C-alpha cells in the first residue's frame, strides 16, 4: 500500500492544463507545495480538500492572480509565466461570484465579450444564448443585486463561460447555495460541461459536490496532492487515513496485519486485501459494520439486509456471552433519508459508525453485536 | 522568493523579459508608474517654487545664512505666534467636529425637503475667499455689526470670532467627507448590531464609527490644516493681537520684506505640517477596509420620533445661525446704499467708472469660471492618478508620496504664489505670461481634495472585482475603466466639485500671479475691499454675493449630476 502521488494520468501531451511542481508561498509558508497535475481537454477535475489546503490558491496561480514561487503553469502546452491574467484565456468563477454591482445581468455576462471588442449585436445574441443555457431567459436587464443566490450563481457561470475560456475554473461553485439547489445545479453543470466540452478545474470542500461533478478527483492536504483518481476509485480506495476521514469515514484504527487478519482495538478483523504483514491502518466502511442481534425482547428483523448474514440465525439461538462479534451500545441514530447511521459505543476500541436500513435500526440504548465484512475493509498506510 | 523556479525538464522556450519574472509580476510597477505624473507635477509646480523662495531667503547672496534660523526661533513673539497657531487650530477643529457631525449624520441618514439645498448651502462658505468671510463676520459681530446694533455685542478681536469663522468655513469639510461615506454605509450593519444586543449609541460606536474613522480622521486633519494655516480670517477678525504663522509669513514677506525671516517661518510651518501628516499616517494606519458601500439614496429615511425631529431642527437652526446669518449679512450689505436699499453696487460692477480696474469687475466672473475649470481638470488628472497609485501600492514609498501630496494644503499660499513669481520666470519654464500659471497654482490646492475624496472610495472597491475583470480578459487599464470608474463616479463628481470650488475661492497665491487685466473674483473683491469708501465696500459685498451665487449654482448643479446607474451602486 503506497501513497499514490501520481504526477498525472500518464504522459498527456495534449493536456489543456499542466502544473509542474507548482509552489506558492505566503509569508514563507508553502500554501501550494510542489503540485503536479494535468487536466485533459474536455475533462472535469475537482480538487477536494478542507479549507486551508491550498486549493483556492492553486486556482489563483493558474489564473495568474497569484504568482508561483516555483514550478510551472502550462496552458495548452505554453508556460504562463509572466502572462497577466487577462491574457491567459481562462475563466474563473469566484466563490462569492463577484458580479459587477454597477452592471445589469446582460452587461455582466457580456463583459468578457465587450473587452474583447465583440460587436453589440453578436454580444446580445450570445448573452441571450448563455442566459438561456443557465436557465435565466430574459433576465438581461435585471440588476444583479436583486438576484437570489442561485440566480447570481448562474449569472456568474454564464459570465465565466461567455468568452469561451479554454479552461473554466470554479472556486467552491455551489458553496453558498442551499442543498436542494446545489444538488440540482450539480447535475445541470455536469451535463452542461459535457455538452459544451468545457475543460473544468473546480475546487470544493464538499465531497458530494466533487464526486457528482468530476471525472477525476484530486484530494489536497496542506498544499500537497494526497490522492488522485476517479470518484469511484477515491471513494472505494482512499489511500490514507486523512483521505478516509475527509471523505467522512470515521471507522479508522491502527492495526497489525498477519496474513488476512488485522489485529486492532476492535479485535481481530478479517480483511479481503493482500498485503505484507506488519503495521497498517484499518478502515471499515459503515456499510461493512454488520449488526447481528439486538437484545432479546426487541424485534429482531430477520428480513433486514444487515442481519441476513450467514451465521446470523445461529447467533440468535446461542447464548449472548457466547456470541461472536463485538458488543456495542447504540449511542445515537442519525436519519439520512433512506438509511440510518448508527453511532455505536463498542465494548472495546473507539466508537464505530454503522449504517442500516430505517426499519432495521435498533433503538438508542439498545445493545447489539457487530461483525465486520471483509469486503468492506480497506487497508491504509500505518498512521504515524 | 525566487524569480525562477528550479523546474525539471526543458526550460521555457520563449520566456518573457526577466523583469516580469518577479514574484509580483508586472503589478509591482503599476503604482510607481502611476506616481510619475503627480510627482513631476509636484516637483515642478510646488517643490521648485517653494525651494526657490526659501533659498532666496536663506541664501540672499549665494551664502547660506543659517544663523538666522536660531534667531527667529528664539524670538518670543514668534513663539507666541506658534503657540496661538496651534491651540486655535485644535480648538477650531474640535468645535467644527462637535457642530458638524450632527449635520453629517442628518444629511447622511435623513430624508427631508430641501436636503440638497442644505448640502449646497453649507458648502458655500468653504469656497468663499477668506477676505469675504472676514468682511461678512465683521458685518455680523464687529463694530456697527448686526449683533452690535441689536445687543451691543462685539466679538471681533476676540478669539471667538476666529473660531466661529473657522467653523463656518469648515463645516462643509466634515459634512462632505464624513457624511459622504456615512450615507453609503449600509444601515443594516447597525441594525444587526442592535439585534445582537447593542444599544443605539453602542451600535453606532462599534459598527459605524470604526467604518467612519478613516473619513473622520481625514476630515479632522483637513480642518486642522486649514485652521493651522488660516490667513484672511485671522488677519481681519483677530486684530493685531492674534497672528498665525501664515499671517506672520505674509507680514514678513509683503509688508516688512524680510525674506529671511519669512523663509524660516515657511520651513517651520513645513515642519509642523509634516509632523501633523506623520501623526495622521500613524493613527489612521491605512487599514484597507473593504467597506460594503450601498447607494446613498437607499440609506436615508424621514426622521422618526421627537428625538430625531429635534436633532434635525437643531441642525437646521445651527446652520441658519452659523452659515446663513453671515451670508445674509453679506447680501444685506451688498444691497445697502446711502439712501436705503438698491442694486446700485451691482450696476457699478459692469462699468470701469470707479477706476479700480481696467476691465469691468463683472468680467472677473468669466475669468474665475474659466480658470477654475482648467484647474479642476488638472487637479482631477493629477489627483486621480495619485489616488489610483495610492490604492494599488503600499509601503514606505507610497506613504511618503501620500504625505507629499498633502503638503500644499499646509504651505503658505503666499509662499507658493511668490515662489511661482520668482521661480517660473526663466525658460524653459517661463510661465509668467502664460494664462496657465493661475490654474496650475489653484490645481495645487485642489489635488489634495481630489485624493482625499477619491481614496476612501477607491480603497473600498473589492480587489476581487478587478480580478474577476482580469480573468474575463480585461487589461488592468480596462479593468479600472470598467470596474473602478463606475463605482467611483459619484466620488469623482464630488472631487471635481471640491476642486472647482477651492479654485474659485483661492486667493493667497492667485493674488500674486493673476494678471491685472484678468482678475479672478476673490482678487477683484480684495482689491475693492482695499479701497476706501462706502461705494467700494458695497461693490465688494456685491461681487462677493455674485461669487457666492456662482458657487452655489455650481454646487447645486453638481448635486444634481448623479451617475446614470446609481440605483445599483
Identify the function of each model-found stretch.
Chain A
Residues 89-91, 95, 99-242:
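ABC ATPase nucleotide-binding domains
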Residues 17-27, 73, 331-332:
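Conserved beta1/A-loop at the N-terminus of ABC ATPase nucleotide-binding domains
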Residues 27, 250, 261-384:
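Non-catalytic connector elements of ABC transporters
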Residues 63:
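Helix-to-loop junction immediately C-terminal to a conserved catalytic motif
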Residues 48-50:
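The feature captures the beta-strand-to-loop junction immediately N-terminal to the Walker
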Residues 71-79:
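Conserved ABC transporter NBD signature motif
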Residues 17, 32-34:
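Conserved structural motif at the start of ABC-family nucleotide-binding domains
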